[in-house]
Each structure stands twice: as C-alpha cells, then as structure tokens.
C-alpha cells in the first residue's frame, strides 16, 4: 500500500472487509482546547500506522464540546496494533480527568455493497 487512503481504495476495489471504529468524548469546557489539540495529534499519528485507511475527529455541531471519532482499519490485527501503540495508550491516559464522558469505542466489520 502506498498510503492509508490509497490502501482503502485498494481494499474496497478487491472486496475486502474492513473494520470501522466510532466513539465520542465530551470535553470539559476548561480543557477543550488542550483536548482538541491532543485529539488532532493522535489522529495525525494514527494515520501513519500500517493498516489505517482513515482516522478522523469531528466537532459535534449540536454540542461543540463533543468530539466524534471515525476510523477505518484494514483488519482487526491493524486495529489491535493501533490500540497497543504507546502513543494510543498515552492519548487515552491524557484524556482522563480532562473529559466529562465517553460513549465508549464501538467496533464494526464492514464490507462494500456492490452497485
């Protein structure tokens, strides 16, 4: 694969399944800027990991303190590796005490639907 996004097109073109991950966090108002910065750094680092097709964070339009994550991974092994990376562990640890709540991580298997 030449890159995360190019790899995603390759996987879909050949009909491979992928792993989708969603989740959200609600930042405290007084820590939002620091939490957002940490989220953006985490996303940028994660995008360079093997098997990462996409990794994004978005601000919720209805509640700007909520940050929503959407990730696509080539397979479960890539996701397990991502969770085991020291940077991922440090990110989760950093968030503790800076957020009000989390929706938890939801993980799905997805496959392309033929057109």
Label every PLM stretch briefly.
Residues 10, 15, 57-65, 92-115:
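Glycine-rich beta-strand-turn "strand-cap" elements at beta-sheet edges
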Residues 19-25:
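Active-site-flanking beta-strand signature of metal-NTP-handling nucleotidyl enzymes
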